[in-house]
Amino acid sequence: NETTVYTPANYSVKFTNLTGKATIGFEAVDATGNWLAVDNFRLGLIGEITSDIIISEVQRLVSEGESLQTQMMYKAEAQNLATAIEQAKKITATSTEADVASAVEAINKAIKAAMVAITEYQALQSAIDNAQGQYDVAKNDADKLMEEINKAQELMKNAEATKTGIDNEIIALEKALLAFNLANATPGSGTAPKVTLTNKYVATGATQALVRTTVTGSNILERGVCWSTEHNPTVLDNRTTKSFSLNGTIFHIKGMKPSTVYYIRPYVMNKTYTVAYGDEVKIVTHPAGGCTWSWNEGAPDDAANTRCRNAIKETIDYFNEWTGIKGFHLTGNYGSGTPTADCSYGGWMRIGPNAAYQAIGTVLHETGHGVGVGTHWIWNNCSDTRQNTSSGKWLGRAATEVYQFLENKYTDDYYFQGDKTHGWGRNATYDWLVNGADKDKHSELQYAGGMCIMYGLFLDGL
């Protein structure tokens, strides 16, 4: 059971517990804030479970399970559901508490698994319905689209299918439908789609990249970036529409291979499937990093340990994606007397009890100290890299180039700088290296962008 929660008030949820255990919690759906607060939590007994209640609840679960049996699902889930239904049907008023709990737990588990499988088949059916709705035998390449529709329909009837097989067929059907629409594209009305700017600077990681482009046009259906290991990629190759907005649009490519040459092109497509492409840009992804981590599980409660552990893991994932560093180990330790967090050169880190600092942004920042920011002589005592030897403008080219790319500002007023301990961009929108919990926007772009700047610092000699 669930109760919808909107504003601060008293809320309750009622349930019948036949298994001896229950999980109670909150699910945030389309939340605009970043926290949930629960106060004055009370667990109350409404009444004892009688044999009539047991039989009624079990019969309800049996009916729910049987209603699912008419729908398409994987063979294993169908068999498990049938077994669980038969087990539940054997429950009587004289059944032991253990037998009731076992039967109810089994059928609940089987129902949940069946619903997941049914949803996956329904997604395939929706893709089939969409393709059939746009199919026209009189149009170009209609035979190719129908061939893929037929394959999908056969899979829809196959209980031996797998989730991977269904997911792949949905992708194949969507690609066939796109190819069909492209083969029958018309100019449409209004201003024709056009890529007006392709930024030749691309921030690359091991499997990801950040790309800037500007497009125009009327009735735009989709804009993004496509890529391939071959020249002149199209929207029928790999493509993404995921983007960030910061003084323009930054598209975010994922799913590439490390140490690989790729060709990318921005594109814009209108609602009648006319596509315009920008200039091709060649990129080479980095080798993946080889950083590792550990957490000493020293926090006083599970929640704090989980926050710290996750922040450290995510930080090392960012470092391995964007920096290529190998041989660095981040050793995370709980510091009960540490007001915020700190890290020495080489990766010995302490995280204190303040939950605001048990976060990815803080750990990314402190790990920067672990690899040289503010802790190595190239940073704090080098006239080749610092305008004032230990502070001021960073004199390396790469860090400022990526900073200007992120801000989309290419004048002399935009450069990377810092003091003897920390670094930041001049006139920055974000504090890219997260110099304080209050500077943490909890933004993927801020984190990835900061790592791109970090990589630039390494290229410059740090």
Describe these PLM feature segments.
Residues 1-19, 31, 248:
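Extracellular carbohydrate recognition and processing domains
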Residues 26-34:
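Short beta-strand-plus-loop segments that form exposed binding edges in beta-rich domains
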Residues 34, 187-287:
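Short, surface-exposed linear motifs at loops/turns and structural transition points
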Residues 49-197, 247, 267-269, 275:
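Beta-rich interaction/scaffold domains
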Residues 327-350:
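Catalytic zinc-binding patch centered on the HExxH motif and its immediate surroundings
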Residues 349-363:
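Short pre-active-site segment immediately N-terminal to the catalytic Zn-binding motif
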Residues 367-384:
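Catalytic Zn2+-binding segment of zinc metalloproteases
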Residues 380-462:
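Metalloprotease/metallohydrolase-associated module, dominated by Zn2+-dependent proteases
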